[in-house]
């Protein structure tokens, strides 16, 4: 198992390109199953979860064509099996996203209950209830979700999400694209990745409106046609590199991104003392060598502060001037990184869903272990500013969400290297 060794103390300085968003790419890849012709998806990030999704298509009999820029062409007409097997699905929660498209397009699906990060309960019941509202008959047995469309196909439905669910919204929206009649999704997720998926569906000929609000309307169509679509930039990767620059007192320009999808994070970075300038597709952060000020953060569904940036801001507060409270309202069990940061000398108290972080001037390098994707990013950020060497184990978590993290940080002047386990 690979590890990262980071020698702290280098101030980050330079420019990097932001990758395509994993959380947009995965539902968009799943949505290609709805099409009755070849579809090309561009700006895919080089990540394990993306490779797994493409491998899953291969297992189903679809032969994706990938070019050197990691654009992929998918022709779902060659599909031979409607089963998403456990050995692939177990490593990736997003595999549940093929359920809606397969039932809508092919009338049935068998998808293993998913794996992925161990954060909270993240139930799949909203996906199941949404499809049942459209007439699907669903059984969960032997670790598999087995779904069948009614005779004549799925029917449009009004569905209310009793908790906001990004993947739930995406799954039901995809299924509704080919259902008969109108579907209205209420209390829908408003995330930019949901909007990106809706834009992709519309590029194939779907009729989706209201994405980005809490009510999405989908008028089902008979077929979806070929399209080329470029995945949006990754707002969490963008935010992670900006926090890394802030923590080290540095200056970083991130390119091929979108400042409008990151406003809550940029606001908190300004509050921490960062000077931020934005263009249409770039953001520059400059700390002018200053130590950040501690900030209070409360996670909530978009457009509020994203839960996927919570761990990074705990790392920022750990070396900031003052004390900041970080309140997690989305997932339980999402402070696992705190105990690893304690090993580096951080002063953090966890009380229920709140972490109280009192900044200290210097953290100390230590052997630490990544516990999930975003927690691992917080360990990398803390290691960049710690005295001495930090060894981060289990970095396969990082590789699930950050493309070429050590190369990008090296371009900014970080002393970081990957060593085989």
Swiss-Prot record:
<dbReference type="GO" id="GO:0051301">
    <property type="term" value="P:cell division"/>
</dbReference>
<feature type="binding site">
    <location>
        <position position="330"/>
    </location>
    <ligand>
        <name>UDP-N-acetyl-alpha-D-glucosamine</name>
    </ligand>
</feature>
<feature type="modified residue" description="2-(S-cysteinyl)pyruvic acid O-phosphothioketal">
    <location>
        <position position="117"/>
    </location>
</feature>
<feature type="binding site">
    <location>
        <position position="93"/>
    </location>
    <ligand>
        <name>UDP-N-acetyl-alpha-D-glucosamine</name>
    </ligand>
</feature>
<comment type="similarity">
    <text>Belongs to the EPSP synthase family. MurA subfamily.</text>
</comment>
<dbReference type="InterPro" id="IPR005750">
    <property type="entry name" value="UDP_GlcNAc_COvinyl_MurA"/>
</dbReference>
<protein>
    <recommendedName>
        <fullName>UDP-N-acetylglucosamine 1-carboxyvinyltransferase</fullName>
        <ecNumber>2.5.1.7</ecNumber>
    </recommendedName>
</protein>
<keyword id="KW-0961">Cell wall biogenesis/degradation</keyword>
<dbReference type="InterPro" id="IPR013792">
    <property type="entry name" value="RNA3'P_cycl/enolpyr_Trfase_a/b"/>
</dbReference>
<dbReference type="GO" id="GO:0008760">
    <property type="term" value="F:UDP-N-acetylglucosamine 1-carboxyvinyltransferase activity"/>
</dbReference>
<keyword id="KW-0132">Cell division</keyword>
<dbReference type="GO" id="GO:0009252">
    <property type="term" value="P:peptidoglycan biosynthetic process"/>
</dbReference>
<keyword id="KW-0670">Pyruvate</keyword>
<keyword id="KW-0963">Cytoplasm</keyword>
<feature type="binding site">
    <location>
        <position position="308"/>
    </location>
    <ligand>
        <name>UDP-N-acetyl-alpha-D-glucosamine</name>
    </ligand>
</feature>
<feature type="binding site">
    <location>
        <begin position="22"/>
        <end position="23"/>
    </location>
    <ligand>
        <name>phosphoenolpyruvate</name>
    </ligand>
</feature>
<keyword id="KW-0573">Peptidoglycan synthesis</keyword>
<comment type="pathway">
    <text>Cell wall biogenesis; peptidoglycan biosynthesis.</text>
</comment>
<dbReference type="GO" id="GO:0005737">
    <property type="term" value="C:cytoplasm"/>
</dbReference>
<dbReference type="InterPro" id="IPR001986">
    <property type="entry name" value="Enolpyruvate_Tfrase_dom"/>
</dbReference>
<keyword id="KW-0131">Cell cycle</keyword>
<dbReference type="GO" id="GO:0071555">
    <property type="term" value="P:cell wall organization"/>
</dbReference>
<dbReference type="Pfam" id="PF00275">
    <property type="entry name" value="EPSP_synthase"/>
</dbReference>
<keyword id="KW-0808">Transferase</keyword>
<comment type="function">
    <text>Cell wall formation. Adds enolpyruvyl to UDP-N-acetylglucosamine.</text>
</comment>
<dbReference type="InterPro" id="IPR050068">
    <property type="entry name" value="MurA_subfamily"/>
</dbReference>
<dbReference type="GO" id="GO:0008360">
    <property type="term" value="P:regulation of cell shape"/>
</dbReference>
<dbReference type="GO" id="GO:0019277">
    <property type="term" value="P:UDP-N-acetylgalactosamine biosynthetic process"/>
</dbReference>
<dbReference type="InterPro" id="IPR036968">
    <property type="entry name" value="Enolpyruvate_Tfrase_sf"/>
</dbReference>
<keyword id="KW-0133">Cell shape</keyword>
<feature type="binding site">
    <location>
        <begin position="122"/>
        <end position="126"/>
    </location>
    <ligand>
        <name>UDP-N-acetyl-alpha-D-glucosamine</name>
    </ligand>
</feature>
<feature type="active site" description="Proton donor">
    <location>
        <position position="117"/>
    </location>
</feature>
